[in-house]
C-alpha cells in the first residue's frame, strides 16, 4: 500500500500518517484510521488544489463502534458545510448495513437517511450471468438470495450447497441459543416477518434480530422517492418480505428454520 500510494500521489506525509496509525494497537488504530480519512480530505485538497478527491472507508462503524457513529457523521458534515479553502463543494456518502447505526445517526438529524434494498432483479441477473457454470437456474438463485449479492457469493463458494451455507449462518449468527430462548416467537416471524411489528412481541427479540443483521425493521413506504435504486415489493412471502419487516435474505430465514429443526 505504501509503495503504490507514494508512486500514485507523491504525498509521502499522508502515507506516513496512515502507516503510523496502522502500526498502533488494535482498537486505537481502527478509530485513528477512520478519523484520518476525514483529515486526509483536508490535507489532500490543501496540497493539490486541483481535481477531485475520493476517500472510501469500508465498515467504518464496525471499526469505531456504534456509540461513535453519530460523531463520525457529524465530522463529515463539518467537511460539507465548511470545505477546505479552494474547494467549492464536498459530498459525503456513508453506507452501513448495521440497523442500529441508522437510528443512532437519524436521531440527530445530521444526515439524510435513505434505505437501499438488495439488488433489483434485472441487476442481479446481470451479476448472475457472470458466474461460471455449473449453477442453478436464475429463478432458483433469486428465490434463495432475494437479490442479495453477498448470499450469492456464499452459495457460489459453497458450490451451491444450500445446507452448507445455512449451517454456516447458524454458527456465525449464534442462532441455536437464540432459538432456545425465543422459539415460539421466531416460529411466527418465520411464518410472516410482520408479526415482529406487533406490540406484544418482545423488544429484546427484535433488537437481537436487528443486531445480528437478520432483518430490516420498520421499512419505508415503497415509493421510489424514499429509496436508493429500486425498492422491494410491498409484500413477497416467498422472499420473506413484509410491509413493515423483511428478512435480509431468504437464506437468513432458512437459517433460523434450520436452527429450530
Q: What are the residue ranges of the model-derived segments?
A:
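Non-catalytic recognition/regulatory regions in large multidomain proteins
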Residues: 62-65, 85, 130-138, 143
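Conserved NTP-binding/hydrolysis module of P-loop NTPases
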Residues: 1-31
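Conserved Walker B catalytic segment
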Residues: 30-108
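Amphipathic alpha-helical "lid/sensor" segments that cap RecA-like P-loop NTPase cores
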Residues: 133-185, 203-211, 219
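Conserved AAA+ ATPase "sensor/coupling" helix adjacent to the nucleotide-binding pocket
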Residues: 110, 126-133, 158
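C-terminal leucine-rich, beta-strand-based interaction scaffolds used for sensing/assembly
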Residues: 6, 172-261
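A short helix-turn-beta junction within AAA+ P-loop NTPase domains corresponding to the substrate/partner-engaging
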Residues: 2-3, 104-122
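Short loop/turn segments at strand-loop or loop-helix junctions that form parts
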Residues: 2-5, 55-61, 220
